[in-house]
């Protein structure tokens, strides 16, 4: 949706440029921060990160949007690691990139596209996805509930309960709260309280050639990790 809206703003700005310079300037001012967010979150991941109702093959590609931004508006992306308003945090180490969601499930006024992906993460190596969320395999129908569920994401189910109560296909009742996050050169930290009041904290660290994930929860927990296609795991 971010990329769809970014293209809409670009088209609107081009359309009003000759007729309304003030409106053109207002629209143009949105382009740089939107470009920075798109690039910072997606570059190095090898795909659109699969948080909430995200997916590939819906909006135009990041590369095509960057080309248009450069040609039409002379805009180049600025890489950032923290987006506290949206709750996304990035960690980069050589060819490794980790992206974690430490934000609210969705805007309060429109939570229907939100998933139970609090403190979930994705990992890519040399632009190849390794750990991914399950995405939006079905937008309507019997599988919609699974794709929005906690277990469909790289996070923790506490006491068998969902992080937030997803009603129907595009509704959310009680939801996560007290969500916060932060990041440094080799770590990402996030914490939150689930809909039923259980506290969850997560720290992701990069140590040499290892990615260490530390979880702290109130109650018993089951962790879920989803490998990208063509990858297998081995317990050691």
Enumerate the language-model features and the residues they cover:
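Carbohydrate-active enzyme catalytic cores, enriched for enzymes
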Residues: 1-132, 182-187
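Non-catalytic C-terminal accessory modules of carbohydrate-active enzymes
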Residues: 78-236
């Amino acid at each position: 949706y971010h990329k769809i809206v970014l293209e809409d703003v670009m088209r609107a700005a081009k359309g009003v440029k000759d007729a309304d310079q003030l409106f053109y300037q207002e629209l143009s001012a949105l382009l740089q921060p939107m470009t920075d967010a798109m690039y910072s979150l997606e570059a190095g991941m090898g795909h659109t990160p699969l948080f909430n109702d995200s997916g590939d093959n819906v909006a135009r590609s990041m590369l095509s949007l960057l080309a248009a931004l450069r040609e039409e508006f002379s805009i180049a992306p600025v890489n950032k690691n923290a987006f506290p308003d949206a709750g996304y945090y990035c960690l980069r180490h050589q060819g490794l990139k980790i992206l974690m969601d430490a934000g609210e499930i969705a805007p309060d006024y429109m939570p229907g596209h939100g998933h139970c992906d609090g403190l979930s993460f994705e990992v890519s190596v040399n632009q190849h996805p390794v750990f991914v969320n399950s995405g939006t395999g079905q937008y309507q129908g019997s599988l919609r509930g699974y794709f929005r569920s906690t277990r469909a994401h790289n996070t923790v189910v506490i006491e068998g309960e969902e992080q937030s109560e997803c009603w129907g296909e595009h509704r959310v009742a009680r939801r996560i709260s007290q969500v916060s996050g932060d990041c440094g050169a080799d770590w990402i930290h996030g914490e939150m309280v689930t809909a039923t009041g259980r506290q969850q904290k997560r720290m992701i660290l990069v140590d040499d050639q290892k990615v260490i994930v530390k979880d702290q929860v109130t109650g018993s927990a089951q962790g879920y990790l989803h490998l990208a296609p063509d990858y297998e795991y081995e317990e050691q």
